[in-house]
């Protein structure tokens, strides 16, 4: 049986190597959720919870996902087109293959899966045995918290997925480990605190354990298939590291949001600029339709706030850079 200590060290090594990737994935997720202010709080004024520009990255990702998600038609062919038996056999194989896709709801899964593929740069897809229906099930998994290793031939040799569950959920699902999960405080603690659990798989074993509880093993079993039942589709990259399509345009989106804030601030200051009046004005009436008596009406006005025209040109340039970096032309 697998050694949990070796597995835990291997998973920690994979997590350490993917630290930069995890940070970038968290930034992309926050930007797509409209939480750019939480990532770069110094770039936004106080009291502003969202950026004042359209979320271009989210719009582009959804649009590209809708293009990639539709599945091709699945048809099996035969080398002997003159044989009725061969054609019937090919038709039956086509029906079987399409039934696998239909029962797995693969078409429905491909829309969020394609979205995550563009956003994060890779997508795990499981092919698991459904022993109840006696059918293979295809499952698309969220890449967040996924770590994996390949051998020199590019084959997957280790796969780990990080989940978060509340303490009470784990106790209810694994009552035999309640003492180890709850610890010395028992039920007299915050049972809604989230606990990280790891599901690890290789060709020999499948393990579910809790790192924060001294690598407590919740479930361990031999891999019934004897091989990896997951594949990871990756976007092509020059250095072999997974990179999302929008990794390079996050800061361009930030610059657009920053320019929008500055433009709004400039407009506000222009409207609220101090009032300039000639020296002969002794009484300053305020309010709508107020009358200012002066012999020099041309001297009455607000302090001008000159905004360079290049500011608005730069906003257009940032929009072009955003489309170029995201490979999303007009």
Which residues make up each language-model segment?
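Long amphipathic alpha-helical segments
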Residues: 55-72, 79-90, 142, 220-230, ...
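Structured, contiguous alpha/beta core segments that scaffold functional sites
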Residues: 3-20, 126-283
